[in-house]
Swiss-Prot record:
Protein name: Nucleoside-triphosphatase THEP1
SUPFAM superfamilies registered for this protein in UniProt: P-loop containing nucleoside triphosphate hydrolases
InterPro entries registered for this protein in UniProt: AAA+_ATPase (IPR003593), Nuc-triphosphatase_THEP1 (IPR004948), P-loop_NTPase (IPR027417)
Domain of life: Archaea
Task of the protein: Has nucleotide phosphatase activity towards ATP, GTP, CTP, TTP and UTP. May hydrolyze nucleoside diphosphates with lower efficiency.
EC nos: 3.6.1.15
HAMAP family: NTPase_1
Protein keywords: ATP-binding, Hydrolase, Nucleotide-binding
Pfam families for the chain: NTPase_1
Residues that, per the record, bind ATP: 7-14, 93-100
CDD domains, A to Z: RecA-like_Thep1
Amino acid sequence: MKVAVTGRPGVGKTTLCLKVHESLKDKMTVGGFITKEVRRDGVRVGFKLVDLSSGNEEWLARVGEGKARVGKYAVNVEGLEEFLDSVRTDADLVIIDEVGPMELKSRKFVRFVENLMGRERLLFTIHLKSRHRLLDRIRREFKVYVIDESNRNRIAEEITRILEG
């Protein structure tokens, strides 16, 4: 089953991915990555990618100047592309958090995700409003859940059951 989760920023998409990972990691191999916020003194200063298999981290974006930008963030396209080389994709379940505007600055990331699309078990988080041919394809081919504070725990349990079966 291919599942995508979307919702507004901060609603719990990454937390949902971590819950699914925690529930399934002893029952099957799980690869992929999550994206975590980095805060300093309570202020978000960027995002780091975290490999679910190795724990390796790489900056995805930071506040500052750079060629590839999304809002106030400079996207570390080169770092993202190097990070992808070590992400485990031969697992029973691959989690990609997130397919969004920052990641889509990289053609290599787009190809990386396209190469996963034929897999049987996938869990992606997708940006709520972004338009891109890859996001359109995911919306067509995946079961898409829109989460909020009232349904995120129930949906995490439902997705775990679906992906386990």
